Design a protein with these regions (language model features):
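Short S/T/G/P-rich N-terminal loop/turn motif that feeds into the first structured element of a domain
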Residues: 1-60, 67-78, 90-128
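A short, acidic, amphipathic alpha-helical segment used as a generic capping/interface helix at domain edges
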Residues: 80-87
Length: 128
């Protein structure tokens, strides 16, 4: 069980996007390409990678969690070096990206050009 108001090294990202393609194509791409390639990448510090669509399926949100800032750095570097970004750009328009947790300066510099905003821990708990 976690401790109350005890910060962890965990880092979370929320990327909200609008769809540029139809919902069926987006869902198929999410399952067959994005989730599959990320899962197969076996990034040790990536804890979760979950896509969601809004009720009318015009917007998508990707939520990721990492053990620490280094996990986000590895994820981002792998993403930029892989085949997914051009495919992603054809299907989605990034509306905003939020990063939560204690993020190292080099990672902030890496992610900021993509419009990320950064949020530090203020209080709460995590039982996992």
């Amino acid at each position: 069980m976690g401790k109350l108001n005890s910060d962890t090294n965990r880092v979370y990202t929320v990327m909200h996007k609008s769809l540029k393609c139809d919902a069926d194509e987006a869902k198929q791409w999410i399952k067959d390409r994005s989730a599959k390639l990320t899962f197969e990448g076996k990034e040790e510090k990536l804890m979760s990678f979950e896509w969601y669509l809004n009720n009318d399926e015009t917007e998508a949100t990707l939520i990721e969690s990492f053990e620490d800032s280094d996990g986000l750095k590895q994820r981002f570097e792998n993403l930029m070096a892989g085949p997914i970004v051009p495919e992603w750009s054809e299907r989605f328009e990034l509306k905003y990206m939020m990063v939560f947790g204690n993020v190292k300066k080099d990672v902030i510099e890496l992610v900021t050009p993509f419009g990320a905003t950064f949020h530090t821990f203020a209080g709460g708990f995590n039982h996992r």
